[in-house]
Structures are given as structure tokens and as C-alpha cells.
Amino acid sequence: MAAPIDTFLFTSESVNEGHPDKMCDQISDAVLDACLAQDPESKVACETCTKTNLVMVFGEITTKGNVDYEKIVRQTCRDIGFVSADVGLDADNCKVLVYIEQQSPDIAQGVHGHLTKRPEEIGAGDQGHMFGYATDETPELMPLSHVLATKLGARLTEVRKNGTCPWLRPDGKTQVTVEYYNDNGAMVPIRVHTVLISTQHDETVTNDEIAADLKEHVIKPVIPEKYLDEKTIFHLNPSGRFVIGGPHGDAGLTGRKIIIDTYGGWGAHGGGAFSGKDPTKVDRSGAYIARQAAKSIVASGLARRCIVQISYAIGVPEPLSVFVDTYGTGKIPDKDILKIVKETFDFRPGMIAINLDLLKGGSRYLKTAAYGHFGRDDPDFTWEVVKPLKWDKPQA
């Protein structure tokens, strides 16, 4: 009889678009989209906070566009489903405060020379270090625990908005624990160990109805059957009651869900949030190009799993450091992969913005602000496009 394989449990969580922190991310990115749509050179650092009956937008924005911030706030909240005080916020009647100033002239001269620098000369908008990660355990080259938690959240919103589960309200959280096997550095998912869903609901529905609907309409369509077995544990609204939600239940802030936005606890994170930031902010553009690099390494067959780190100094275009680790799964040494990465990718912020087409607004950034920035199949997510990496397979 074969010896039992050594496995471990790893958990990732997600929140859906009605969670107050995620609502703030979406408002900040809706503002960014509006600024870039009118003026692609807009410099945006937009934060949002919310509590009962209140949304405040604040930060530094320099744009030639004429942007109606209050209108954007109300429309974004309305689209999420916050249309009455009962569900957590009334988009049409809540108080909206706007405190927006221009970008500091000190930062402007150092980063883009008050818009006089050529793209290749534009410096990083701040110091910091960013990570990109990829793994061959899913078609998206993303961690399964994160993919499932994220898709459960997206599905919750889908069945709320299409009327399948009319008792649902906008706020909700999901969490998935996966049992993994470590195959010499590569991650191999064996099964789903635990599924947790806590979703806001109306007064009329019973806990039994909630559990039955979540299993049938949310879990079943999202989690492949091969990962579920008789031992899988389900915690469905384990607190017993979740009627009060959204900003009425909890305060919300932009940039408080950075692990949900990225890799669900896998890889690493430099700490900088994404939403509300234009592409000169390397917290965002640096993390996007690092994901493209890591994904390209795995997709090109150079490694089964990979992390890429880059770092910057404010006002300096070239990264200070680039680091690659393939967790022992590389087909050639990591130092050789690093050389290929440096030859293939341009990590200067102005060039990232051009090569990934990051100066385009519309609803591009709003889409990123819920259900993850990575692993999405959407042409606007340009950093998900694999760059083929040329390498010589070592002789066997």
C-alpha cells in the first residue's frame, strides 16, 4: 500500500462588491476612470471612506477633466445595489462629502516634471516594492483557494442581481480552505476542505433556506465536483443573522482588501493598495507588470510556480531591484530566468503605462475593484496577456 501523501491546508477569503471596503475601492476607481476618460494624463490619488448614510471622497487629483465626484459616488453605490437605508445605504439620499486637492507640486516636479518628461523619463510616483505571482494549479495560473473564494463572491452578486435569490442583499464574504500537496515546490490542490459564506439577507428568509439556496445556486455552479467530497465542511451564515450590512454594518475604506485584490495570501505583498491610483503610482502599475512577468514565466514553461519582486525610488524611472524565485520549480536556474525577464519587460513606470495601455479610463479600473485584479479573462486586463519568453530547454 502506498504511503499517504503529506498534505497541508491553505485558506483564502474574498468579499463581494457590497462590502463597505470594496464599495470604497469601486468609488475610488470610478473616479479614476472618469478622470482618465477625459484626460489620460490625470494624476489621481483618490481615497474613499464610508459609514452609515455617509460617503466621503478625498485625496489629490490634478486633471483637465470636469468630473462630477458626487454624481460618480451616487451612481457607483446605486449600481452595487445600495438603493435604500434597509440594505445598508441609500445612494440617492446619503450625505456625500468631497475633499479633493491638487497633486503636490513637489511630487509633480520630481515624478513627471509637471507633465514635461517623456514616457521613458517618468519616475516612480513613490518608493515601494511590489510582487507578482503565478502558479500552474488553475487555467488562470492563479491559486485555487483564491480563485474559488473570488468566484463564490461574484456568483453571490450574480444571483442577487438576476433575481435567483431575491432575499440576498449586497454585502457578503466568502472563504475557501483547500487541501494541497507540495510537489517539489509546485502546488497541487487535492480537495476543498471547507467552504464559508456569510451573506447579508433580508428579514423574510430562514437560515435553512439560506443554506439550501447557497449550496444549490452559489456553491454548486462554482466549485468543480471533483474537489468536493463527503468530508467537505460547509459554514453557511454561521453567525445566524446578517440583516444589517454595507456601510450601516461596518465602516469602509479604500485599500483595505489588498490580499483579496491579489493572490489570496499566496506569494507576497508590498503593502500598497491599487484602487484610486493612476499608473504613475507604482503600487498599481508595478504590481501589474510583476504579475505579467510571473504569469509569462509559468505560461512559457520556465517554471510551475513563480514570484517576481520589483522595487522603486520616487522620481527614478528604473527599478532599484528585480527578483525572481521559482520555488525550486524552474527548468533553468532562477538567475537565468531573471536575465530573460529583464531583457523582455520594461519596468519603467511611463513605459508600463504605454505597454499595458494603462492610461485608458471608461469602466476599466472600476472592473478591477471587485473580484480581483488578476486571473481575469477580459481584454481590459492587459497585464494578463502572456509575453512568450524565449529560452533553451536544457539537454536531458
UniProtKB/Swiss-Prot annotation:
Q: Which cofactor does it need?
A: Mn(2+); Mg(2+); Co(2+); K(+)
Q: Provide the residue positions that the database annotates as binding L-methionine.
A: 60, 103, 250, 281
Query: What metabolic or biological pathway is this protein involved in?
Result: Amino-acid biosynthesis; S-adenosyl-L-methionine biosynthesis; S-adenosyl-L-methionine from L-methionine: step 1/1
Matches recorded under CDD domains: S-AdoMet_synt (cd18079)
Q: Which InterPro entries match?
A: ADOMET_SYNTHASE_CS (IPR022631), S-AdoMet_synt_C (IPR022630), S-AdoMet_synt_central (IPR022629), S-AdoMet_synt_N (IPR022628), S-AdoMet_synthetase (IPR002133), S-AdoMet_synthetase_sfam (IPR022636)
Q: What induces it?
A: By salt stress. Follow a circadian regulation with higher levels in the light.
Q: Which UniProt keywords apply?
A: ATP-binding, Cobalt, Cytoplasm, Magnesium, Metal-binding, Nucleotide-binding, One-carbon metabolism, Potassium, Transferase
Protein family according to the UniProt entry: Belongs to the AdoMet synthase family.
What is the annotated quaternary arrangement, including any partners? Homotetramer.
In Swiss-Prot or TrEMBL terms, this protein is called: S-adenosylmethionine synthase 1
Which species is listed as the source? Beta vulgaris
